[in-house]
Amino acid sequence: EGAAVEPARAVRALADLGHTRLLTEGGPRLLGGMVAADVLDELCLTVAPMLTAGDAQRIAGGPSVTLPNRFTLTSMLEEDGFLFTRYRRT
């Protein structure tokens, strides 16, 4: 495994370089780290019309958070049963 990323530190470093928007794509560990670091402002989530079973993690895995982050649905598109959603932090 590679070195761990500290989300809050990475966001600050990129902001110091003048970056005002970030797009992160990854798995449950990266998303969980972003949530725990309290640096997630927006979430784009795709829901597929398929079900499977197994022991996979939740959408976000990692450190616990004291209070859940609240988001508001800002847009939703449907195509062939797939839902493309966008949420913004409230």
For the regions a protein language model found, what residue spans apply to each?
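Enzymes that bind and transform nitrogen-containing heteroaromatic metabolites
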Residues: 1-90
